[in-house]
Amino acid sequence: VISTSETSVRRLRGLAAVAAIATLMTACTSSGEDMSSATSPSPTSGVSLPVTPVTTTLLDPGAEPRSTVRSVRSGDQTVQLSTRSAVTQQIDDQAVQDFSTPELTLPLTATDMNSSDTVNLRVGTATSADQRLTDALAPAEGSAAGLTMTDTGAITALRITPSDETQDSARAAIEQALNQAVYRSVSYPEAEIGVGAVWTVEQQVISGVTLNQVTTATLRSRDGDRLTIDLRIEQTPESTTLELPEDAGSLAIDSYTMTGTGTLEVDAGKPLPLSGEVTVGGKQQYSDPEGSTVLRQDISDTVRWTTP
């Protein structure tokens, strides 16, 4: 006879990787993935990823002089986006498992920004700390992506169209990196602001669990359209339950912390940050419905922008 506790342990052992992926929207391919299947070419097909709407609230307009910030984009822009994530988890007192993903560097060129709300992106030669992923990324050079943006800089949609020879692992890595960057971006208030202005950007992040994300932005400095903005991010789960994909069941969320900070240098005339880094991390604890087995996670992810 198998006890309820033994059944729970077996169930959680099988769901551990699923939970890691479900709760971390930045996951790409884990270090233990079978690259023989993950790197097979797949037919080109574009994917459009809707982005949850933002609510921006001005808390302090800052010092005079003040003026509005409007994202009126023109010309081309070339930047590098780097992302990385660290994920470890432990079931009860078993050995700690590592589901971290290697750092990915993605050169991006924004072009054809004549439309008021559309930004076209071209992917350059992407690289990874994992040589296997770097090899898989090589055929993805020239892939297309795009952003739909408001005049206050809020991103409302992300679309990705990989090149013909893009492999599955490369497609997933690019998609996750861009998605991660979208939810670490910042939009501007409608009202006039000056140095010292503080505003919040509220948005839901949909992964395995719906998270309410509040980004508090502080305008550290401003020189015309160039702004340096400090960010403080906090995520809280909307539910007390983590629903696992593919009807794999659910886990109770016993505790959940996810916070972060960073600084972005932006130009209102360009769609992507010029430079900066944002890191968000925290600890979570889940348990099976019987409460006899506990899954603990430690997660951290970083987005970094540089201009070559």
Tell me the role of every PLM-derived stretch.
Residues 154, 197, 270-272:
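Residue-level signal for well-ordered, solvent-exposed loop/turn and beta-edge residues enriched
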Residues 2-16:
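Bacterial N-terminal signal peptides that target proteins for export
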